């Protein structure tokens, strides 16, 4: 949840969990006022997302229906590691999924590549196909879908091979930080039936999209 006051998400992470919950409440109310009835919480620190979900369920706050992933699963030093769900290796991936399901996750978010977090490389895959498959298999066992943050081209291939349900960004980014569209990967995406969320608004101002 962004505060809407011009700060970046890195600056916002300096806030306490309590302040971030209050920011989330404000955002829920704004979405509802705009007529939005369902939104995703797509990776929140600690139990912030689950707290908002419980607040809505108990009628403490008003807002849209909230589908919460909770903490995104990431590798040591990986994108959004500050959310505090670190998993390295197949067994830790399974354990993280079980923990998140127990806490109330509606689906599982996995950081399959680096991103905007300082120290990570967006064009580098964060997990092996086997690690991703372990998380996907465990999530499906508990009737949960999976979403993977994939900026790196290699992370896209691995997510498809692992059976991930939804791919975020799908940037075809190389380790040299250059975009190189690969038709063979696009064909894999089509044949697998994986859902794609290109998140265009993350990189382009909304007015620019309209124009």
Locations of regions flagged by a protein language model:
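Short amphipathic alpha-helices and their capping/turn segments at secondary-structure boundaries
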Residues: 49-60, 90-104, 179-195
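Active-site gating/metal-coordination segments in enzymes
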Residues: 77-133, 168-172
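N-terminal small/glycine-rich loop or linker at the start of catalytic domains
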Residues: 1-9, 67-83, 132-134, 209-210
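Active-site mouth loops of central-metabolism enzymes
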Residues: 9-23, 78-96, 124, 141, ...
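Divalent metal-dependent hydrolysis catalytic cores, especially in the metallo-beta-lactamase
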Residues: 23-49, 63-74, 105-116, 145, ...
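Metal-associated gating/positioning segment near the N- to mid-region
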Residues: 1-58, 130, 151-162
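Active-site core of metal-dependent hydrolases
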Residues: 76, 117-211
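Short helix-capping segments at alpha-helix termini
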Residues: 56-64, 141-143
């Amino acid at each position: 949840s962004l505060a809407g006051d011009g700060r970046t998400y890195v600056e916002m992470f300096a806030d306490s969990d309590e302040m971030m919950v209050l920011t989330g409440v404000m955002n829920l109310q704004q979405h509802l006022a705009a007529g939005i009835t369902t939104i995703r919480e797509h990776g929140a620190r600690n139990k912030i997302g689950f707290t908002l979900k419980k607040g809505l369920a108990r009628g403490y706050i008003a807002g849209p229906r909230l589908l919460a992933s909770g903490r995104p699963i990431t590798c040591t030093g990986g994108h959004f590691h500050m959310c505090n769900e670190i998993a390295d290796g197949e067994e830790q991936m399974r354990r993280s999924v079980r923990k998140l399901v127990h806490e109330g996750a509606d689906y599982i978010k996995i950081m399959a590549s680096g991103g905007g977090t300082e120290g990570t490389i967006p064009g580098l895959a964060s997990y092996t196909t086997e690690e991703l498959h372990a998380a996907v298999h465990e999530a499906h066992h508990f009737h949960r879908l999976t979403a993977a943050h994939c900026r790196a081209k290699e992370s896209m291939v691995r997510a498809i091979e692992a059976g991930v349900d939804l791919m975020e960004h799908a940037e075809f980014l190389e380790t040299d930080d250059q975009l190189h569209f690969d038709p063979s990967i696009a064909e894999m995406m089509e044949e697998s039936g994986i859902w794609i969320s290109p998140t265009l608004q993350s990189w382009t101002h909304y007015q620019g999209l309209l124009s």
